[in-house]
Amino acid sequence: MPTTTDTPISPATATMLVRLEKYVLPIICGFLAWQRLRYLQQQYTAWHFVNSHPGMSLFAPRVFYADLTKNFLIFAIQAFTGLTLLSNRAPAVLPDKLKHVMVPLAASYYMILYGLVGYFPMSMQQSMLPDAWRFPVAMAALACSIIGYAIAVWAIVYLRRSFAVFVSVRDVVTNGPYRLVRHPIYCGYLLDAAGLLLAASSVGMLLLCCGYVVLLVCRARMEEEMLAKSDPAYRHYLARTGFLFPRLASLAG
């Protein structure tokens, strides 16, 4: 029996949703990018104030610059996403099922749910790490997030006008990071999720990250199914590239 998300959508509805993707989602991305830019400014102002008053410095410079880099990459992703959505090509094949819209939207804005960790029981919020491990693990978490966001920005730059939120068919990109892996943007997002999980090291964050992984994998599989159905050459691409992470043979070649 088909589920609710398998419900077909009409071409007229799909066209309206694609227009929403092109003209409304960029506004949301622009707002998020502007908010991140304001946060970066506040972060720098606070750092400058602390360092201009001897004895008030709380963080090592390397930690501050790493966190600043991470937040700049988040800003870059949000800005690039909005710009690429505005300039993307019309899809050759429109989304034809409700899941092609709902799953990508849920995956794209799932990060909002990370704030729910604060409403979990205290036992699910507490870090499972010993005190002595927390700082080095936090640094590893920051590194994971920076690498993840850098990979995502790199992939969006190569995807350009083929970038989309909803599952549809546009030109297949096979150069840059796509030469090694079919979903480098999602690879980057998963590394960021790993960073969040390491930073929190709590049961609550583990549950939320597991939900995010499921959504990303479902989204990627739907994209591949639609592309393989519409483009025979994509099947050869499937055979020689990794899903979310590069194959060892691809790296050796």
Regions found by a protein language model. Name each.
Residues 170-188:
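Solvent-exposed interhelical
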Residues 1-166, 195-253:
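Membrane-anchoring alpha-helices and their flanking helix-loop junctions
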